[in-house]
């Protein structure tokens, strides 16, 4: 049966920022079928560079998939923008599932 993804977005950790890097992570959990796409936007502009997607194998218990998408930035790049958004497109929804956060509210 088709299953819609549960989508979460996570800002970089303070520990990572202290080292000069910044990874924003979008998690999509327990979806089916496997075909899914993620689009990253920074302040409303699509960002393709530095994105790494990783799909986990089918879950033996409920036959769903999970995926993480990591947007890797420098700390300076991260701190020069405010709104971070991942948009997830899956057949279970006619419109994208959108998750975002404002950096200055973290």
UniProtKB/Swiss-Prot annotation:
Alphabetically list the UniProt keywords: Disulfide bond, Immunoglobulin domain
Q: Which InterPro entries match?
A: Ig-like_dom, Ig-like_dom_sf, Ig-like_fold, Ig/MHC_CS, Ig_C1-set, Immune_Resp_Modulators
* Keyword Cytoplasm assigned: no
Question: What S-S linkages are listed for this chain?
Answer: 26-86
Name the chain's protein.
Ig kappa chain C region, B allele
User: Any idea where the Ig-like domain is?
Assistant: 5-102
Question: Which branch of life, at top level?
Answer: Eukaryota
**Family matches, as Pfam families:** C1-set
State the GO CC annotations.
Answer: alpha-beta T cell receptor complex
Q: Does the keyword Electron transport apply?
A: no
Q: Which residues cross the membrane?
A: none
């Amino acid at each position: 049966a088709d299953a819609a993804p549960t989508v979460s977005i996570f800002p970089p950790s303070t520990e990572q920022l202290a080292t000069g890097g910044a990874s924003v992570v979008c998690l999509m959990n327990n979806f089916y079928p496997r075909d899914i796409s993620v689009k990253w936007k920074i302040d409303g502009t699509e960002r393709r560079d530095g994105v790494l997607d990783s799909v986990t194998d089918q879950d033996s218990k409920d036959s769903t998939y999970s995926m993480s998408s990591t947007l890797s930035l420098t700390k300076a790049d991260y701190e020069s923008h405010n709104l971070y958004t991942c948009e997830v497109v899956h057949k279970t929804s006619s419109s994208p599932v959108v998750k975002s956060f404002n950096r200055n509210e973290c």
